[in-house]
Amino acid sequence: MAYILPGSSLDADLYAITDDALSFNRSVIEVVKQLLDAGIRIIQYREKNKSSNSMLKDCITIKKLTEEANACFIVNDHVDIAVLCNADGVHLGQDDLPVDKVRELIGKEKIIGLSTHSPQQAQKAIEMGADYIGVGPLYPTKTKKDVCEPVTISYLDWVVSHIAIPFVAIGGIKQHNIQEVIQHGAKCCALVSEILSAPNIPLRIQELRQAILLAHT
């Protein structure tokens, strides 16, 4: 098992992110249940086309499910919803509220992750007190419309060599390239469409974990 935050609840090899639009008409709650049953222990709630009230209802339910499974629950962007549902943490983008200000709102016990796309952003994330960073997008991706150009494996190599805090590799990671990501030093990989769009989510997760094991041999 790979560690993102040793000794904390944020501890896993795969980091799953929700997206209703990619879930084959399965509800986000159904998807989360399948993820947890398949052994996923970090789930980020990222929904762009729902009302705040709908997102809060989802997150209250997901928090209960993840708590029962001893899994970590992260809310994307919405600090208010993260606080109201008592999520384990929040994940921020470069254009979201500053990490240090969010820390004042959610407290020292909660996890704050920050997406980064360059060495400068990674270093600033550390200075501002992020608990972990997202590293990517490593490959082309259509999951997010407002994503920057791929930072490529070279940025991952830089992070592995220079950054001491935990990080999550993300962006265009698939079954066919996850071994490359692991071999370049990533301990945790975030995936969206590769998991959510699979007809059989537990089977896809099993296949991904087999690929990760092969990367270590």
Swiss-Prot record:
Enzyme class: transferase
Manner of cofactor binding, per the entry note: Binds 1 Mg(2+) ion per subunit.
Catalytic activity entry: 2-[(2R,5Z)-2-carboxy-4-methylthiazol-5(2H)-ylidene]ethyl phosphate + 4-amino-2-methyl-5-(diphosphooxymethyl)pyrimidine + 2 H(+) = thiamine phosphate + CO2 + diphosphate; 2-(2-carboxy-4-methylthiazol-5-yl)ethyl phosphate + 4-amino-2-methyl-5-(diphosphooxymethyl)pyrimidine + 2 H(+) = thiamine phosphate + CO2 + diphosphate; 4-methyl-5-(2-phosphooxyethyl)-thiazole + 4-amino-2-methyl-5-(diphosphooxymethyl)pyrimidine + H(+) = thiamine phosphate + diphosphate
An MF annotation (GO) of this entry: magnesium ion binding
Keywords associated with the record: Magnesium, Metal-binding, Thiamine biosynthesis, Transferase
Gene Ontology biological-process annotations: thiamine biosynthetic process; thiamine diphosphate biosynthetic process
Residues that coordinate or bind Mg(2+): D77, D96
Entry's EC annotation: 2.5.1.3
Residues annotated to bind 2-[(2R,5Z)-2-carboxy-4-methylthiazol-5(2H)-ylidene]ethyl phosphate: T141, K142, T143, G172, V192, S193
Cofactor requirements of the protein: Mg(2+)
List of residues binding 4-amino-2-methyl-5-(diphosphooxymethyl)pyrimidine: Q44, Y45, R46, E47, K48, N76, S115, K144
Keyword Cell division tagged: no
Pathway assigned in UniProt: Cofactor biosynthesis; thiamine diphosphate biosynthesis; thiamine phosphate from 4-amino-2-methyl-5-diphosphomethylpyrimidine and 4-methyl-5-(2-phosphoethyl)-thiazole: step 1/1
One term under GO cellular component: cytoplasm
Family from the record: Belongs to the thiamine-phosphate synthase family.
Task performed by this protein: Condenses 4-methyl-5-(beta-hydroxyethyl)thiazole monophosphate (THZ-P) and 2-methyl-4-amino-5-hydroxymethyl pyrimidine pyrophosphate (HMP-PP) to form thiamine monophosphate (TMP).
Name of the protein described by the UniProt record: Thiamine-phosphate synthase
Lineage: Bacteria, Pseudomonadati, Thermodesulfobacteriota, Desulfovibrionia, Desulfovibrionales
